[in-house]
């Protein structure tokens, strides 16, 4: 309607979160590419928690905290992962990465083989965790007065 306000900001953030979660969970439903639904749900939860830290800081008067793995970062990684998976499905491009060892398995959250969808989910999970921790530490510092407000 050409106007902005608190409701518009609220609606924008709500739709962003629904889309973020929807994309990651939809990837998890595609069992053809070996991404487990429970892994996708975990990645969606971590993504949501990272976003929550930014809005929670705003709710206690700090202003919106941005930083970490942003929505734009997640979207770029997800779109690139989808393109890569499409090329793999069409037989145009082959990516076969077999993960060995406990640490390697930990880094890719238990996926046995990586592909475009797996990359998107793993990056979303680790990015969500990184964002959650980064924003929490930033908000904590501002609330306790040890870090100037950015």
Question: Each predicted region: which residue ranges?
Answer:
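Hydrophobic alpha-helical transmembrane segments
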Residues: 19, 23-150
């Amino acid at each position: 309607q050409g106007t902005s306000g608190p409701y518009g900001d609220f609606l924008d953030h709500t739709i962003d979160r629904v889309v973020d979660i929807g994309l990651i969970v939809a990837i998890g439903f595609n069992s053809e590419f070996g991404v487990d639904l429970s892994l996708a749900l975990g990645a969606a939860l971590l993504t949501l928690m990272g976003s929550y830290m930014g809005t929670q800081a705003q709710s206690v008067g700090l202003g919106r905290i941005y930083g970490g793995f942003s929505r734009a970062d997640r979207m770029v990684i997800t779109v690139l992962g989808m393109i890569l998976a499409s090329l793999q499905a069409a037989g145009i491009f082959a990516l076969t990465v077999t993960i060995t060892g406990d640490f390697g398995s930990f880094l890719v959250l238990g996926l046995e083989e990586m592909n475009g969808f797996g990359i998107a989910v793993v990056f979303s999970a680790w990015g969500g965790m990184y964002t959650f921790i980064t924003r929490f530490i930033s908000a904590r510092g501002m609330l306790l007065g040890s870090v100037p407000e950015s």
